[in-house]
Structures are given as C-alpha cells and as structure tokens.
Amino acid sequence: MAYSFTEKKRIRKSFAKRATVHQVPFLLATQIQSYAQFLQENAPVAQRKSEGLQAAFNAIFPIVSHNGLARMEFVSYHLSNPPFDVKECQQRGLTFHSALRAKVRLIINDRENPTKVKEIKEQEVYMGEIPLMTSTGSFVINGTERVIVSQLHRSPGVFFEHDKGKTHSSGKLLFSARIIPYRGSWLDFEFDPKDILYFRVDRRRKMPVTILLKSIGLTPEQILAHFFVFDNFTLKTEGALMEFVPERLRGEVARFDISDKNGKVVVEKDKRINAKHIRDLDSAGTKLISVPEDYLLGRVLAKNIVDPDTGEVLANANDELTEGVLEKLRDAGVKEIQTLYTNDLDQGPYMSATLRTDDTADQTAARIAIYRMMRPGEPPTEDAVEALFQRLFYSEDSYDLSRVGRMKVNSRLNRSSGTGPMVLTDEDILDTIKLLVNLRNGKGEVDDIDHLGNRRVRCVGELAENQFRAGLSRVERAVKERLGQAETENLMPHDLINSKPISSAIREFFGSSQLSQFMDQTNPLSEVTHKRRISALGPGGLTRERAGFEVRDVHPTHYGRVCPIETPEGPNIGLINSLALYAQLNDYGFLETPYRKVENGKLTDQVDYLSAIEEGKYVVAQANATLDKDGNLIDELVSAREGSERETRMVTPDRVQYIDVAPSQIVSAAASLVPFLEHDDANRALMGANMQRQAVPCLRADKPLVGTGVERTVAVDSGTAVQATRGGVVDYVDANRVVIRVNDAEAVAGEVGVDIYNLIKYTRSNQNTNINQRPMVKVGDVVARGDVIADGASTDMGELALGQNMLVAFMPWNGYNFEDSILISERVVAEDRYTSIHIEELSVVARDTKLGPEEITRDISNLAEAQLARLDESGITYIGAEVEAGDVMVGKVTPKGETQLTPEEKLLRAIFGEKASDVKDTSLRVPSGMSGTVIDVQVFTREGVVRDKRAQSIIDEELKRYRLDLNDQLRIVEGDAFQRLERLLVGKIANGGPKKLAKGTALTKEYLADLDKWHWFDIRPAEDEVALQLEAVKVAIEQKRHDFDLAFEEKRKKLTQGDELPPGVIKMVKVYLAVKRRLQPGDKMAGRHGNKGVVSKITPIEDMPYMADGTPADIVLNPLGVPSRMNVGQILETHLGWAARGLGERIGNMLKAQAKAAEIRKLLGQIYNESGKVEDLDSLSDAEILELAENLKKGVPFATPVFDGAHEDEIRRMLDLAYPEDIAKEKGLTASKQQVTLFDGRTGEAFERPVTLGVMHMLKLHHLVDDKMHARSTGPYSLVTQQPLGGKAQFGGQRFGEMEVWALEAYGASYVLQEMLTVKSDDVNGRTKVYENIVKGEHSIDAGMPESFNVLVKEIRSLGIDIDLERN
C-alpha cells in the first residue's frame, strides 16, 4: 500500500481486525452538496435541474396580469463573482455573497386581438444577494462564520396512528390518519369513541367524513358500495331467500333452523355455526337459504329502491328495514333487495353510521358545509365555494405533496408506481379512508412515526430554497398588480420587479433563523460536528417543551444513520443528533447507510446504500461476524437484524443478505474518536464525545498515542490542515505560505503550474481560540495530491490532536483529588503543555453625535504620559504593546454639552480664565481581568473621510505584501514556464533564431543559456507542433502578467475605497489582543471517556509520586472515579498508552546507540506486523525508516478502532515488547507490567501497593477559570428593582438568595442580614449615604426602605387592591 508524504513520517499502528472496503465519505459532503444543488452555479443554463433556485423560479413564473394581456416569463439566472473574498468579509464585517441576476421576458399581447403578441421585452434584473458557502461548508454573515444546521422533520405523506387508548376513559383505541403535504393544508381523518368517522382540515372543526366524500362527487349509494359488501335477498310472501356466502356465516349464532336445499336441517336454532356446518351446506350445493321475516328487520339497505311502475323512491340507501318498509316493497312488487353485510369482528358499520349523522343532501351542500367550516361568517357564493374547494387540495399553487410526499403516499396506499401528480386526487382521499376503516376493522398495522423512514432531513439548500420561494412569491403579488400598467406606461421588467422582499427573506433566514447558528469553532472537531448536526427543533419542527420521550429515544432505524451516543445533555437530549460516520442523504432526503452485499454466505465488494425503508426488507449481519480468509461467514449462526422492527436474531449464514461495512458505522465522528468506546458506559461515552468538542487548542499539538484511526480523516476534512490540491515539488516555504510547482502531468496545458497556499496566522476563531497554520514541508519535498502540507490548530502531522499525552497515576493524594479533582505536576505548566493562546477582539467606533463628531486622537487631556506611551500619533496602540486591564488602547474624545460647573471649577475658571475642556474621554480601554499583547490593528474609515496615518500605513503594508505574493508567483510561473520550454526545445531542430542561428541547427542547453530568456520566443522551430506550444507559452505568460496587474489594481481599489460602516459611524478601529492562558487551579480538564475534573493544585515536581527510575507522574487521578462510572476504557487507554511510550523509548535508545536501519526495521516489524492491520514497511527506504523512527521516539501511536479495537492479549503483548524484563525491573513494574511501585515524592518512601500508571490523552476544556473569575464592588443596577445585575457580562454581583438568608437567620446575624437586604442591595438612599459616611470616615449604616418593597406594593395595586404602608 502506498503511504502519503505525511503518513509515512509517522505510521499509526492499527489493531483493526477487518480491512475497510469502504472509505469514510467526506464529512462535510451533505452541507456542501446540498448548497451546490441549490445554486447550480456551474451547471450550463440548459442543463439545470428543476431544484433549488431554478425550481423556485419555475414555480412562480410565468406571472400573468389580471386581464391576461401581459405576462412575465423567466429565462435563466446567473450569479456574479463575489465582491470580497471570505477573509476580507470577515475583516470588514460583511456577508460573503454573490449578486443574483435573472433574465426575464415581458410579453404584451394586443388588446384588440388577445392571441397576437404586441411586443416582447427581455432584460436582466437584479434579484437580491445570495450568501455563498465557504469551502468548509460554513457561511460568513456580517463578518461572523455561521452554520445552517440540517433539520429532521416529519416526511410529507400519509400516516396512520392511534391514540394508544389515552383519549377515552374506556381505553378504546381511536384510529386516525393524516395526509401531510410539503406545503398546503393538512387533512386529518379520525374515529370518535362512537365509531363515527370524521375529517378536519388544518385542525379546524371536525365534520363527518361523508361530507368530504359527497363533495368529491360520490352519492350515498356509491359511498356504501366502496366500503361494504352486500347480502342479496329475494323477497317471498313470508320471509325471504338469502344468497348463501359461506364465509359470512361462520361464528354467528343461528337465529333459526338452517336447512339445505333438500330441506334437511343442518344447524339448529341458537347453535353457533362452525366450519363443519359450512362444509356440509357447501357440499350439499346450497345456493340459497330460506330466512324468516325477523332476520331482515334492522338490516340496512345498500341502494335506493324505486317503484318500477311509478318511479317513486320507496326507500333510500342506508335506510333500515322495518315491517312498514317491507310491506311497502311487497306491495310495489319489488322482489330483489340488497343490504349491507356487517359484523362486530371485521366488518363494522362505521361508514353507514357516519352517513346517518351527515345531513347534507348533495355535492353542492357538502361543499358549502366545508366552506362554512373554513370561512365562518362569510356568505357562500357559488364561485367562492368552488374556488376554495379547488384551492384546498387540488391547486398546484397552494398545495404541494412534493416528490417525497407522492412517493410515500403511493407506497403506503400499496400502489406500484412511485410517481403521480403533486396534488391530492380523489383516489388518494378514498384509498386513505378505506385503509383507515380496514385498520379499525383489525386489518393492517399503524405507522411508527419515529421510524427514520417517516422522518426526513432538510439540508441547507432546501431550507434556503423555501425562504427564497417565500420572498419570490411576495414579489409575484407586486408584479401581478403592476403588470396591468406595463403596456400603457411602457415599463421595462426592472420597473416591475423589486428585489427587496427576496433579499430580506434570505437575510432574515441566514441572520436570525433558529437553524442558522453561530459556528462552534473551538477546535476542528467542533466545526465538523456542528456541520453534521441534525436538529428536530426549528421552524416546522418540534419544540423542546412538547417533545415526548419517544421522539428523543434511540430507534432501531438510527443504526448507521444517526449516532446513538452523541447528543447534548439537558432539555435538548435526543432532539439534536449527529450524523453517523458513514451516513449520507438520498435524493428524497432520507438517511442512508452503506452495507456490503453478501451472497450465499460470502462477502462481495459491492457496497449499497440503504435507507431505513429499504433496509427493512433485508437481513443484515453485524461487522464483527467471524470470516475466513476468503470472506465466507464461518459461524453456524450469525447475529443479524431482520424484519421491520430490526430485532437482533441468530440466523444461518445463507440467509444473510448484507453486512455492515465497518464496526464504527453506528457512531458519529466525535464518538468514533474515543478509543475503547466499547468498554465505556453509554452515559459517560456521551460526555466524552461532547467534551472533545470543547477542547482548547494547545500551543503545541500532541497527537494522541492511543487513537482510533479517524483522527486524520477529521483533521483533513475539517479544512484546518492544508491539503495539496495537486501534486508537485515544494519550491518555497516560509511561515506565511507554501509554494508548490505542479507536476507536468497534473498541470493543464498552457496554464501556470504553480499553487500558492497562503496560511492562516494567529487568527481569532468564533470562540476566541487561536487558529494558526504551520508548514510541514521543506523546499524540495515531493508531495502528491491530497497530502497534508500544513498543520492547523489542534492538528499534528495531519492528525487531530485535541489534548496532550500525560503520564497518569491512579491513586489518592492527600485529598487533592477528592471528588474528581485533578492534581497536576508543575512540570506540565513549566513545559507549557496546556498553555493556549486566546485572541480577543476589542473595537471602538467614532460616531457623529448631535454635539459634533467624536474623534480618535492621542490628544486627551488629564491622561498621564505613561498612559499615552503606547499610542502612536493617530491615537492607536502599537502592534506588540503589552497591555494590562484599564490601559488605553485607542484614544477617543466625545464632545459633551455645557454642564453645570462645580464651585471648584468656577474658581479655577475665574483664576486661570481658561475654558475647561468641552470633551469627555471615551477611550477604548482593556476590560477588567484581561491582559495580553496587541497582535493586530485594523482601521476602517467611512467613504469621504480623510484617512489618518495609521490607516494609510496599514493599507500600504497590505499592498506591499500582496505585490510580494504576485511577484513571487510571477517569478515561479516564469521560471517554471522557461524550464518547460527548455525541456521542449533542447534537441529540437530550428529554422532560425537570435544570434544568427543557422537553419536546421539542433538547439542545445548552452545556446539557450546564452540568450536572454525573452528572446527564446524569437526562435523558429522546424516542427509546427513545437512552434505552436512556444507561442502558447508566450501568450500564457503575457496573459498571466496582465492578470496579475489587474488583480493588483483590483486589490488596491478594494483597499483604498471607503469602508461600508453602519449609519452614523465615521471610523472604526479593531484591536486584537493575544492572551496567553497557562493551566491553573480551577481550569476544567477531561479525558476522552467522560472523566472530567477540575485542577485542584499544581504540585512541585519533587513532591509528585515517582517511579523507581526517578520519572515523576504528570497527573494524579482519583481511582474512585472509575468503578461507579463504569468507563473502564480510560484504564485500557492508560495501559496501551504506557506500552506506546515504552516502545518509543526503546526506539529512542536504539537511535541514541546509532543502531543500524535493519535492526530498527526488525523491531518495527515486531510492533506493526504481528497482530492487527499489517503495514508495508518494506516499501520504505532506510532513510525513511530512520525518519519514521525519529518521529516515534516519544511514543508509537496506536489506533484501536471503535468496536474493533485492541484485545487484552494484544495490550499485554505490546507491554511485553515495550518493557523487556531488565527495563521492567529498573522501572519497578509488576509482573503484568500494568502497575508500578511508586514512591512518595515528599518522604521518598514507597507507597504500600502498586499503582496503575500509564499514558492518557487529557484535554483542557474551554471552561477556563480566568473567564469565570469576577468580582464587583459597585456597578450597574436593575432599573425597576434597583438591585445589582447578575453575571460577569453585566459586571453583576453575587446573588444573596433565599437559602443564604436562611443561613444568616439561623445564626441570628441580624445586622449582617439587614445590611445585605438594604444598603448592599436596593436601598437607594442608604447606598449613597453609606458612601458619604465612608468618605467622612464614619462607619455607620442608616438602613431605609428597600426599593423592591415599593415594587411589591405597586404590583399589588396593579391587581386593584389598595395597599398602603402605615408607619407608627
């Protein structure tokens, strides 16, 4: 197997038992593909599919005027290039967007002859701005990165359910059906406790369902014919003959003697009819049974009965037979009658009973009844009734089932075709009611609405399309009204279309929708996870309060689609989920997961993606089934999931149809990063997966020694690590950029074969963590496409590295690790292992005020020179200045109005005659509790305002850097082009050239070297092909120079034009502070198994427990944190990490002893190839083996994939390999090598029993004590209650709550209590008085009336109760 450039530098030893057939798909594919389908930016106009923007335009256009003479058609749309790139948008606080322009055609017909076209106008119209997605799947909105989270909602279609017996006290199951469209009115059908079937539209008042059936044109006779089978009777003068249908009699009690045609009694009266009786009647050839008169009474007629002579209706369908009716029928000579067959078991009389409750006469009456229900109080005119009825379910404008909805309706109603009209049809309604009646009759099953076949995912593209469509339909209404005037006023399309509604709909969605979220950017994993999140909340979804247990629970269909582990704790549990590692969406928006095909018990390499619905048809085995080397299932019974319930059963191998592609396919990206996940309790695994997203990137990333093999995938797919887009040779590297000369094979002919990667340096993330990329390649390195060439935040050699590998001992230590506290060695702090850089952005704006403009200046009165020392002449701090809380960073003065002077000021004025300054100091100062180094300053100036020197110098600097970039590019491009030319020309025959080159001379390197490079183009090669290529290169270089000049001009224009600032703002300055945070007591740390704790003490190295060879532990954890929490994974990780560290030490010792490459190769072979996945070490050269060994000195990285990880014996093998007997003895290891005799650092005595010691990957989480530490003396108060505000952001106080008051009461500390509830809180006069007293040197309190008492009095008065405080 071939290793990539970075992979062979440090190979991760994998314990996976199964080779992967199917690679993990690109992690951000759902987001990026969805939005690409929405925009269809690069698709040719003619080939655009009807989805996204195209579908929205097609749905709204053509727009026809009210009189029908003018209409506007849509031709095509295109998106312009974005005016600023992503980085510029982030700096300037703009949205990264593109202008949408649509070409529309206005067609006006002739008034006299409406079929004749009078004129056609075609024009391109601006339709608003559409935000573009960045390459990593996020959006930049007003300068901040946001993510649109996908939504899991109920799929359109038809659903059948029952109330589980909760509605009615008897516990009777009430069945209901609901037809949910993608857009339009919901149609519900439901039984009530009396078994009458009702329908309702949009949850309005319910009406008998027969009204709906009549309104679609069915008569009562037809309704009964659809829902019942009939009994046929022939009337006799006394009694009647009934047509004998055997099945209908079984189980009934005979109400009279039943005889066969020969008159022999087969069933006696009051006996139950069984199968034998029916067989006897059948074998006797019975066709008719004679029944007495009372058998007919109470039966219901199926059809209207008309007098054959007079045409008079004798009885209506659905009438009950009485003696009177029978007499009437006999008198009229009616012989044949049909009645409804019903029984209590599986043929209930529901529709017949419903018809009786319905008093509408015909179709018109039924439609009027529906109109009255929808529009109560409006007069039902014929047109209005008809229009409303059509619009409810039959009009494409207001009703849309969508492709998914139609497919789901057809499959649920058992139709063969998956396609059909996008509106409801009469058949749909009728079939749904039939199916519901069958359910009530006990045939069929209700739907499970939590099944992932009934829930689909709406991605960014679809959500944006819905918003765009909403905006476009508002435009449509305006256009319709103005189209009438188009002809008379000679208007053009752009006069008719106003793009505001579209822009505002899109802006509102991206800016403030519940699904548009501020991107979690703490580390690369949090970005990836946020983009793969699936939320059931949001518009059209559930709400936290109403979501029950079932919706939140793990469902069998989540397998391989949604992660059962990763979900937030708290009110959102189960409503916000994460996409499983291999899952993807199908065309309909349902989640699919890949399975390997199995044929006759043998695995094939075919991988199929199955949705939850399709999977229900197959038997699917688990990935850990035992295989032989040819891929045959060898166990007698294999555990597999089958049936719609996906129950796990044991089946024989020949029945297996599919098998999982990988053991990790059931979990999400975050959960698959937890090694030994299979040994952790699910609750702790959940915490572990969630806490990895809060890990702060450390100064130096350190790859986990024990990983799972997914680290590289996450790091690369997140976009943090830079990948080479094309292979080539590294030409130039510095901290800011990597330049690669592309391989000839990958370069397109005639283009410049140079890729320049500008790296991100010290940039602030959304969570104020630091994003910084470092190059990993040297000049001359050969890289292939997809290789990692630079590391980003929290990545180490292209692998995700969220924390640091620590030597951990599990033992109590003087109570400092009580209750999950963590004891840390000073060495960890001294080596800056957990030091992180946080970047704070502080900004100040100078506005235009009523009293005049604010000014950013260095000239501030009454500020000491020491305070101004950091400011330059423009009043802005220098880069590199180290600032503390309270220091001025940008000087700013605001004009203030004439104020009342104090007597002192009056005196000064009288003496010095100067006018005291009329400006107040409103400078930007460093907030309390913050200190750091200024690393960047940006100045934005409004158009038309003169720039200060600082702003100008920033622009010059930026242009200089850009010019340098371009010159570099040009140098490489030209150098590269001339190298290619040299390879092309040397040895070719020329017809002439500079320096009097003779015709027919072969070109040599020496001749070319003598020429000035630009004169090479004057050579006239003999071969036409070569001449053409020479000319092409010349044109390409000139074009490139021209392009570069244009690009530079464009950049200069962008930088020198004024900035777009909010109204009233003249100038804005942003200062970026880098704050270094070392680990300190109070910081939260965690492992990857949900083992979290707070640092309690940083202990001197000499006091830490140490091993026999003197190595002290880095961290001491409490062993009591393991058993009750059942996350044993951390212990296994510690053992395997210990082996990894030991193997690294062995390799390091060999390198120190300058061992031969062959020896090292042998040891590496033992490590890598004796169990688990085999590595191809033979393909590496000796130099590469030595470089690999050098990188393994600190520990051999292991991968133990989720559910397919290292077994106990493998960990033992690795420990034995790492610590041969001599080393084990020296370190004081026990026989198992998993525990060590440790010594107390303070006394030097050995602890009385061995201690588990090893290496664990520990994270520092984003809950830092520096961000939480806060104190207040005086500060802001709440307006109404006058009590201090709460929280650090508001500079609030600590709440002295109910329980604290009880504590003081219990101690009887009455004066303390009085002070707490009055002068320290909301006694306004008392507060000021205390201040006065302290100033005067008196330490006394005058407690008065708390303001909240007045609030209470006012509240009571507002209830209309007069209350007064009487003082006596």
Curated annotation (Swiss-Prot):
The name this protein goes by in its record: DNA-directed RNA polymerase subunit beta
Keyword presence, Transferase: yes
Keywords: DNA-directed RNA polymerase, Nucleotidyltransferase, Transcription, Transferase
Record note on quaternary structure: The RNAP catalytic core consists of 2 alpha, 1 beta, 1 beta' and 1 omega subunit. When a sigma factor is associated with the core the holoenzyme is formed, which can initiate transcription.
Keyword Metal-binding: no
Similarity-based family: Belongs to the RNA polymerase beta chain family.
Gene that this sequence comes from: rpoB
Catalytic activity of the protein: RNA(n) + a ribonucleoside 5'-triphosphate = RNA(n+1) + diphosphate
Its job: DNA-dependent RNA polymerase catalyzes the transcription of DNA into RNA using the four ribonucleoside triphosphates as substrates.
Top EC class for this record: transferase
One CC-aspect GO term: DNA-directed RNA polymerase complex
